[in-house]
């Protein structure tokens, strides 16, 4: 009898645990999950596993071109933005780089490993972390070799408009500086055509745009990214080295499927736009937090109450199955900042209410 009741209580515990749905609002990924078109494309192309990859990836480049507006000839396909930056470091051998902080910077290590000096340009909290274009441009002296701009910013969710980017591109062009714009979150932006730096790549050979599929198409396990450049020397160099990061057949098939899945793309943008507005207005009436107006699919929040830290909020949310990100370890921020991404309406209600209970 005892064992029966133990089994019973164990079942109860398991039931109550399974009722707490895990909401990964810390990963900044599309809440719609992997597109069905991608799963289908992979299943349909299993026979391609025994076929060598095609260095040209023509179909995929055409799909990316139609999706992004980049010229097919300017698109280089690879596994991750990190790989592209590694190649750029080898290609440009930079001695001095500027990184904007706070900002998602996965490249410090690569630059340092290549003996590059890093100059951090801080955007002030008082200005809501917006980039002062005139001041930033004044720092772009001829001894700078490369600059990285995360747009929208991977930490603050702020966006730099295309006009400002063009100002920066002009100065970089005049001073022979490579300008790398990481558009990891650009797919989530409302008016991405008029905010993206892609049109600048055909005008300026020194402007390079990086994008990947991890966040918007929710496929971190796939590894597919692309670089856009019109620089003939860089393109030739990559050709000669035989594109060491050519992608496999299954990844190519998945890529073609996602970039042509107009329904998924439109639904994702609509959901994020709606939820971004709702979450922002639900939180904006509360005096105990400060918000930074988000352009991407996540929001940065500053906790104003002395007694509460980012860790406290994370710990409070976790037993409820809600995962949010403390920004204590991000350069330019401290333990008063949290960040979470927009999920589906039900999950966002829960996120907003739970965060407001503690802050």
Locations of regions flagged by a protein language model:
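Single conserved hydrophobic/aromatic residue that forms the stacking wall/gate
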Residues: 1-8, 12-13
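Glycine-rich phosphate-binding segment of PLP-dependent enzymes
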Residues: 19-51, 250
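Phosphate-binding glycine-rich loop
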Residues: 57-97, 103
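PLP-dependent aminotransferase-like
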Residues: 90-149
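Active-site phosphate-binding strand-loop segment of PLP-dependent enzymes
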Residues: 127-189
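Conserved PLP-binding catalytic core of the aspartate aminotransferase-like
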Residues: 272-273, 286-320
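PLP-dependent enzyme catalytic core of the Aspartate aminotransferase-like
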Residues: 319-320, 331-359
């Amino acid at each position: 009898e005892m064992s029966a009741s133990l089994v019973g209580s164990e079942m109860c515990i398991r039931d109550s645990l399974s009722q707490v749905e895990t909401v990964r609002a810390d990963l900044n990924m599309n809440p719609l999950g992997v597109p069905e078109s991608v799963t289908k494309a992979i299943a349909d192309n299993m026979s391609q596993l025994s076929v060598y990859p095609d260095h040209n990836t023509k179909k995929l480049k055409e799909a990316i071109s139609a999706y992004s507006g980049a010229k097919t000839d300017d698109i280089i396909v690879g596994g991750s933005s990190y790989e592209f930056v590694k190649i750029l470091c080898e290609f440009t051998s930079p001695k001095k780089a500027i990184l904007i902080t706070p900002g998602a910077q996965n490249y410090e290590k690569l630059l340092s490993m290549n003996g590059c000096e890093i100059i951090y340009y801080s955007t002030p909290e008082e200005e809501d972390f917006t980039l002062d274009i005139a001041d930033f441009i004044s720092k772009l002296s001829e001894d700078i070799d490369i600059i990285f701009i995360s747009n929208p910013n991977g930490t603050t969710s702020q966006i730099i408009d295309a006009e400002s980017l063009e100002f920066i591109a002009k100065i970089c062009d005049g001073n022979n500086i490579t300008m790398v714009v990481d558009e990891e979150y650009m797919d989530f932006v409302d008016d991405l055509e008029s905010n993206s730096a892609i049109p600048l790549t055909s005008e300026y050979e020194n402007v390079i745009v990086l994008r990947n599929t991890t966040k918007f198409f929710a496929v971190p396990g796939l590894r597919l990214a692309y670089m856009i450049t019109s620089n003939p020397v860089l393109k030739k160099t990559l050709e000669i080295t035989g594109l060491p990061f050519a992608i496999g057949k299954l990844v190519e098939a998945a890529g073609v499927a996602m970039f042509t899945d107009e329904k998924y793309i439109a639904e994702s943008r609509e959901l994020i736009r709606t939820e971004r507005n709702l979450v922002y207005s639900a939180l904006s009436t509360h005096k105990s937090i400060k918000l930074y107006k988000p352009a991407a699919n996540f929001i940065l929040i500053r906790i104003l109450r002395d007694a509460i830290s980012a860790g406290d909020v994370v710990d409070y949310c976790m037993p409820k199955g809600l995962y949010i990100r403390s920004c204590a370890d991000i350069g330019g921020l401290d333990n008063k900042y949290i960040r979470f991404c927009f999920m589906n309406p039900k999950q966002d209600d829960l996120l907003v209410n739970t965060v407001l209970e503690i802050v």
